[in-house]
Amino acid sequence: MSKNYVQIDPKDNIIVAITPLEKGLVTQVAGKQVVLKETIKQKHKYSLNDFDIGDEIYMYGVLIGKATLPIEEGCAITTENVKHASAEYQNSKEKFMWTAPNTSNFVRRTFEGYHREDGKIGTANYWLVIPLTFCENRNLDVLEGALTEKLGYETKKDFAVDTEALINQFKAGATNEAIFNTPIISTKEEITKNRLFSNVDGIKFLKHDGGCGGIRQDSETLVKLLAGYIVNPNVAGATIFSLGCQNAQISMLQDAINAIAPNNKKPVHYLEQQQSASERHLIEEAVKHTFLGLVDANKIERKPAPLSKLVLGLECGGSDGFSGISANPALGYASDLLVALGGSAVLSEFPELNGVEQELINRCETAEDSKKFYDLMSAYSASAVAVGSGFENNPSPGNIKDGL
C-alpha cells in the first residue's frame, strides 16, 4: 500500500488520500489498479470501483453512505454524489469478545492527584462560581473582575495596567519624569507568576443563558448538569448565585447534588440576591466566601494515586478526514488501556457514534445498558428528523471541507 493513500478496511470501497493525488495517477489497492480521473484533495476519498445510483459505500468496514449519482472508478467522493446512510441496528447483542491490551508497563504507574473525601481523585483543583439563572451573569462578571487578576489567575487580557503604581508615585511626591518612567504594564505571564494559592488551579465562572424563561424541564436538566460540575473531583467547592424568583431554585440544585453524591461534603455557598440587603452586600459576601473557600482548597496537595482512579473525558473538535485514522484510534487504544487498568473513559457526544450503534450495543455488558443506548440513539434521531434534520447534518461545513 502506498504511503500516499490507504484503504482502511478490506471491506471499504473508497480510498483515503493521505497526500494530494493528481489526476492520472495510477494507484494500486488490494491488487487492483485504479487510475484517478480527477485530482483528489488531501484527506478526501476516491472510489475504488464504479457506483450506480443507490449503491452502498463503505468506510472503516461500515456503511457510511449511498451514491446519489453514477460515480466512476477513480473519482472523488463528495457530498454532491453521496448521501448519508448507516446500517440498521437492533436492541439485541451479537457475540463480542473484548481483548484487553497488555498493561504490564502501566500497572505500577501512578499520577499526582487531588484526593477527595468521597474517594474520587481529581487531576485539577478548581473553585466554581455558578449562576442559577442568566440574570446573575452580571454578578459573575463583577466577581471575576474582583478576584481573578488580583489572585494571580489567568485572565482574558494579554496584559494588565497598574495605575496604582502611578498613584503611589504621585503620593510620594515623585517628579513628572519619575512618574512617566514608572513601569505599569504586566504581561499575562507576570500576572500568573505570583499566584497566591499555588494548589488551586483557578476559578471557573460558568455563565449560561438558562435557569428561567423556558419550560420547567429545561431548568431541571440545567441543575443536574451544574450538580455534575460541582461533584466532579476536579472541583474543590462552589459559590452559587441565585436571584430568588427563577425556575432553577436552590433547592432543586441541592436535590440534584444529593441524587448523584449523597455524601457530598464539598463547601457550596448559596447566595440569593432577593434575600440580600443590597447588591453591594451580596458581592461582598460572595467575594469573602469564595476567598475563604480558596484558602481551604489550597490546603489540599497532590498525592500519588493509581491509574484506576482516572476518568478520561473524550471530546471531538475540528474533526477532519484524518481523525478516524489518527486521533480516534489513538484515543480508543488509550481508553482500552485505561479501562483494562480499572479506570474509565467517557464519550458524551453520542451523535458521533452514528453508524456504529450495533458495535456499541454489542459491547454493552448488560441488556439494560444496551437498551439505554439503543433508546438514546433512536430518540435523538427521531427528534432531529422531527425538525427537518438528521444525523447527516452533524458534520459542519468545515468538517466536510477537510474531508470528513
Where are these regions (language model features)?
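Metallocofactor- and cofactor-centric catalytic cores in central/energy metabolism, strongly enriched
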Residues: M1-L404
